[in-house]
């Protein structure tokens, strides 16, 4: 890189990626990857041949059958339409941009070694990147459909896992690895510049930034991510919780997920 041979630098990055030992990611255990029956279904539903039916938590197309995800296939039939919004519920749109089907699909790839799942990830995430560019810095992203900080955090946490499941995939090229890492950097920096002022959202955002910093220490901004994320988490121990340990949001579900974020 220092002598200007950027392609060779990228080749070395790929070699490093293939052989690296990842940090301890509490969300990934490669020694025992067994997708559930539902995860296998979600992996297959997301394929082009099944009309890009992307799993979203609690959102199903009743007209297509029992527990069948909605299709995000474009009307022209030749791609994905990320603006499809079947229910009109804001939460559904947010969940679409969390990419909740990608980890189940990655687990299915890892257990089967079927490259069609890796190729689908590359196709779908690559398309998402093109169709959902990051807003300019200074834009109010509090309720942004695809770049709301909470949803960015969910994507970032999952990207850290995806890069482990697909580590040895022959479909992951130098160019694709570079693209994923570039946008991992973009995601972490976006969160740091747009932390929520308070609430469980802020805790999840800090967890995501910390994950990126600790699991990808080779990246240029990793030290800043780790410092930022752990700093916010440390502050949240007192700012987001009552002295008895109860989350100030007051919701049991958020309390449990907030505690999980400190793992």
Predicted regions and their residues:
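Extreme N-terminal leader/anchor segments
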Residues: 1-63, 71
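Short linear motifs in intrinsically disordered/low-complexity regions
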Residues: 3-6, 26, 30, 82, ...
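Short alpha-helical hairpin
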Residues: 54-83, 95-96
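Aromatic-lined, polymer-binding surfaces characteristic
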Residues: 74-76, 86-263
